[in-house]
């Protein structure tokens, strides 16, 4: 217990449950044909609830950075540990999802199985990409001053408004003359790597986790809430309002549209957008105050946290079945909450049970 960072266990559990909530919301604005809102009621609840938990993935990234960055061990040893604990379970579950849902095995040579119930696996390749970056940036991080880190965080913060800038372009000038989306600052069909490519995206959350570890001092609960509450409020509005206002419901409900409509609606929900980033900081500020390590922590939180990677990897196998059972029987908010909670409990118990199997358990669940 002495070397364990207790609040990160609380964070893993909370973020993992948030992921379940995000995926429990999806059937209320998506179906097999594309975008679908059955009613205004469903649209409102899906928006209100999902917008509150978009911080889930960035919180996982910050937890990894808080623990691992800067890297203090030899690069080879660092990569070998990540290979066994992260990449191997990902590879095995990728195969499990592909087999379970009759996916195309050939596509696995190019990407994770995004076209079946396995889209949530995108998180792991992204995280592995950050792991590739960590040893490269560690010498700089060890020597960087707080002012320098804040400067880079400011640059990254500017990139979090890009989703809104793309929308502004569309509002001012209409559809781009070439390409699927408006390009910004050096991006074009023959160059996907614009000016801010290397200081944008989840890199910022990695840097933010490092900043909290090295430079953020302890503050009281009252001050924490005084800072976190307005950050969360502003961020939540920036996430929820654009989604809700852009639902194409002029002709009434139900609303049926191509899948691309949902992708467009989710612009303000993007994990690296400004609104989500504000809620991430707010959540992290509050969660790092959770340091109680008594019986509840030892018997509930820590086991759930240790099993959380396996829970994440397998949860869609459980959630899809639970959703099919509960969605027709409950109203939207109850169905979302119950689906998320039941899926979290079942997947966590399965992950904890699998982890008890010698060797194989860690291959599957990290």
Region spans (language model):
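Alpha-helical transmembrane segments and their immediate juxtamembrane cytosolic regions
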Residues: 1-366
């Amino acid at each position: 217990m002495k070397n364990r960072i207790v609040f990160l266990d609380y964070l893993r559990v909370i973020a993992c449950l948030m992921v379940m909530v995000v995926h429990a919301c999806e059937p209320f604005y998506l179906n097999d044909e594309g975008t679908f809102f059955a009613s205004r009621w469903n649209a409102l609840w899906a928006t209100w609830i999902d917008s509150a938990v978009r911080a889930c993935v960035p919180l996982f990234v910050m937890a990894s950075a808080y623990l691992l960055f800067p890297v203090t061990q030899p690069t080879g040893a660092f990569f070998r540990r990540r290979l066994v604990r992260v990449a191997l379970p990902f590879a095995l579950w990728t195969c499990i999802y592909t087999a379970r849902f009759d996916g195309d095995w050939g596509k696995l040579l190019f990407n994770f199985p995004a076209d079946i119930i396995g889209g949530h696996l995108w998180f792991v390749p992204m995280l592995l990409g950050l792991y590739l970056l960590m040893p490269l940036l560690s010498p700089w991080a060890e020597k960087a001053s707080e002012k320098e880190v804040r400067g880079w965080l400011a640059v990254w913060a500017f990139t979090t408004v890009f989703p809104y800038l793309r929308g502004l372009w569309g509002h001012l000038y209409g559809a781009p003359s070439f390409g699927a989306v408006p390009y910004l600052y050096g991006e074009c069909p023959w160059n996907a790597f614009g000016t801010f490519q290397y200081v944008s995206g989840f890199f910022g959350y990695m840097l933010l986790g490092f900043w909290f570890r090295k430079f953020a001092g302890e503050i009281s609960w009252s001050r924490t809430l005084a800072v976190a509450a307005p950050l969360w409020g502003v961020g939540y509005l920036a996430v929820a309002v654009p989604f809700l206002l852009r639902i194409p419901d002029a002709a009434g409900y139900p609303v049926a549209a191509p899948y691309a409509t949902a992708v467009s609606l989710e612009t303000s929900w993007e994990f690296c957008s400004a609104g989500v980033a504000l809620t991430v900081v707010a959540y992290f500020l509050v969660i790092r105050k959770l340091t109680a390590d008594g019986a509840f922590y030892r018997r509930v939180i820590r086991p759930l946290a240790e099993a959380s990677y396996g829970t994440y990897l397998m949860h869609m196998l459980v959630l899809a079945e639970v959703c099919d059972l509960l969605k027709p029987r409950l109203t939207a908010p109850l169905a979302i909450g119950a689906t998320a909670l039941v899926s979290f409990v079942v997947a966590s118990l399965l992950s904890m049970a699998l982890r008890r199997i010698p060797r194989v358990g860690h291959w599957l669940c990290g």
